[in-house]
UniProtKB/Swiss-Prot annotation:
Segments of this protein annotated with the region B: 346-561
A Pfam family annotated for this UniProt entry: HSP90
Entry keywords, A to Z: ATP-binding, Chaperone, Cytoplasm, Nucleotide-binding, Stress response
UniProt subunit comment: Homodimer.
Keyword Transport applies: no
Region (A): 1-345
Nucleus is among the record's keywords: no
Gene3D superfamilies, per database record: 3.30.230.80, 3.40.50.11260, Heat shock protein 90, C-terminal domain, Histidine kinase-like ATPase, C-terminal domain
Role, per record: Molecular chaperone. Has ATPase activity.
Region of interest: C: 562-632
Protein name: Chaperone protein HtpG
Broad class of the protein's primary localization: cytoplasm
Organism field: Chromohalobacter salexigens (strain ATCC BAA-138 / DSM 3043 / CIP 106854 / NCIMB 13768 / 1H11)
GO terms assigned for molecular function: ATP binding; ATP hydrolysis activity; ATP-dependent protein folding chaperone; unfolded protein binding
Amino acid sequence: MTTAAHAETLGFQTEVKQLLQLMIHSLYSNREIFLRELISNAADACDKLRYEALENDTLYGDDSELRIEIEHDAEAGTVTVRDNGIGMSRDEVIQNLGTIARSGTAEFLQQLSGEKQKDAKLIGQFGVGFYSGFIVSDEITVRTRRVDQEQGVQWHSRGEGEFDIADIDKPERGTEIVLHLKEDAKEFADAERLKHLVRTYSDHIEVPVRMPKVEKAHDEEGNEIEGSETVTWETVNEATALWVRPKEEISDDEYKAFYKHVAHDFSDPLTWSHNKVEGKLEYTSLLYVPGRAPFDLYQREGVRGLKLYVQRVFIMDDAEQFLPLYLRFIKGVVDSKDLSLNVSRELLQKDPQVDKLKSALTKRSLDMLKKLAKDEEAYQTFWNAFGNVLKEGPAEDFANRDKIADLLRFSSTQTDSATQDQSLAGYVSRMKEGQQKIYYLVADGFNAASHSPHLEIFRKKGIEVLLLHDRIDEWLMSHLTEYDGKAFADVAKGDLDLDDMADEEEKKAQEETAKAKAPLIERVKTALGDEVQEVRITHRLTDSPACVVLSEHDMGYQMRRLMEAAGQPLPEVKPILELNPEHSLVARLEGADDSVFNDLARILLDQAIIAEGGHLEDPATYVQRLNKLLSH
């Protein structure tokens, strides 16, 4: 570090260096976004000044007309973007332009693969902001002065690992960014090109974006008068808040461009919902469903929420109070007439209007997803990205549990595919005559679920079973108890009750078999002792010799593993061993002498636990027993 009269050279944070290099190489084909990102930042700076000036309008001084200006110099090869917003202090410059103050940055960078197309999508999803300037320039100079400070600051870097920072005199508040364009990016030092980019990407920005317009006087014969040039400033964007305009006047392209502004995303949203509500609760909302998940989706404490405006005045980004956690992927704005202009995050937690708004916006979001679900392909894209987050809903939002249940999708024996594309409504429509319950099975993965012995009787009878193989699924089902008046039943827990679908002859045969095998059951109970809760004959198996089930209210194996991994102490749970009386191994067990019987009984128990996704406490002994039997 070198220091001289408030001038110093500092190094970029490691993550910034990595991001700069990756971005410069990965985003080359999409490099015109640099202007959108810089204008978006400038608009945010104007919004922040407008908010601070609510309590102190002297901050405007004699310059209350907020604006963004873009100039270019073709000869020098520069593009300048300036605003008269809030500006930055020296500390803010170092913080904002030298570091990435976002949790999960290191993890995000690890996801990058070196494939340009794939990385471009990921980087766009992260939000590159100011650093996008380095896609088109090899040198950037920033001059800024925070509105409440007398001293200005200059920041300068070539994007190679360090930056210079120095105090300067800057009479006007706000920020000016000068991009020194690379040789292959000189095309951007052109008025028409810049206007086109503003109108394409930033037309919806509420702050006027102005560019200089040169006009020349002409004589009576129409010839230009030399030296008569005058420069005026021309507003080149629409400069009105998109959400306050009537829906019928807004094109799909404008909606998509606005989404990219609020979400800092490169890709289009899947759908959106624009509503203006008048009456007891007055608000306008514009909500979006993104087309892909952000890298920090599963950080429940991460940054999320809507942009909050009150009477069109920007109040804050990431206002998380207006949507429940399971809808944290929804992006957009809410503009309320019922909240105070001096509202803060703390006050939002106490304002009864916020709860009403949250309830209304939650309903809007769920209705938007219900509408999206009519387009199966688009909804599948949504589900693949956000399904696991939506599954948090039934536990968090009892009032909307039925609406959320309609939106859930599962794998199923109906398709025997790992793709989660089957709805509960679809399942109910396919239920067999006499079927009273919705059957499901929880496992660690799709293959473990689809090959589970518990499915054998269901496949034989043609009864559909939902296959749940996400980590959250067992927890989900502990809060989702019924759908459309039908109770859910875990096929791996409790007694299997298919009596409603069995004829009298079948029931009678099962009862007789159970009586005939009673001595065998007693022998197995004695052999296994306290390793099992119970041993019984089952008719749920057709191909496997045995399976283990848990009591109806016991915690499943999947949930136990999650709790144990989190360090939670859990009471011991003993399984129930069920034997298939028709299987040759069970017949062999029945005829075995005591020297073989105990080993074979334990092997059947251990195999059933493994098939269920459980873990053996002593796998070495299991292998010894198996080898001993195989060598006979």
